[in-house]
Amino acid sequence: MSQIALSRARLPTTLEISVTDEFGEPHRQAIAAERALTLYLNRREIVTLMTLGAEPEALVVGYLRNQGLLECVEDVEAVQVDWEVEAAAVVTRHLPEDLEARLSQRTVTTGCGQGTVFGRLLDATALTPLPPTRLAQSVLYRLLDNLGAYNETYRSAGAVHGCALCQQDRVLDFVEDVGRHNAVDTLAGRQWLEATGSEGEADIFYTTGRLTSEMVLKVAQMGIGVLVSRSGVTQKGVELAERFGVLLIARAKGRHFQAIHADQRLILDAPPPKRPGDRDAARARRKTSGARG
């Protein structure tokens, strides 16, 4: 890969403010940073992202990659971030011939912190179903336990999402940002810029955010067949996951989870002990679900 002219514009992810607690006592509290960063591709304004500012170069490259506006890292000549003007300039050797057409086909999504996806990606015909990846329940539990050590910004300040590339129960790479889509884009950009190879090793993607259509699309583009979240799933996310062969694990907290499109891919080798009332609670959830349907 040719050398990229890359700025190093990392900023602190938290700052302290004065707050008053419920007893009227003043104290200092860490809060998550949130900064606007306008992305320019060969002087063409693309989007303004709200970000922590931890890895802005990786974020903008990953954004362009995941939106289908950048086909390979070898096309990138320079990535320069200037926080004084809140801008990131990406210079490439080539641009998609239909760039203007792609930019005109933006769809507002349910993603917080970003919320757009280009029409070419929603068409989804360019993506083929992924080979099935099997996941053992015991591996999922170990992974969830291991992930607890990585949410440093969330523990100190809250108000951020985290995403991770994982190989079974091993965390390969972890990123936090104010939006879950920023976090996945930063991971994608980091893998390209650092050429670490961990994306190729990853078979599980973890996010703290909802499993929406945009999240499923981005993970499918990365070739990862298992998507895990501590949050819930949307209708379009379920539909696209079925099309691409992505196993969804939603509401994964502690020893609880909800698997979608599991088929024979989820190996139930570590069922947790049932507690009094679990059966009644499950029956009530099924009854409520049936009434809503």
Regions found by a protein language model. Give the residues of each.
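Glycine- and Gly-Pro-enriched alpha-helical subdomains that act as flexible
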Residues: 154-209
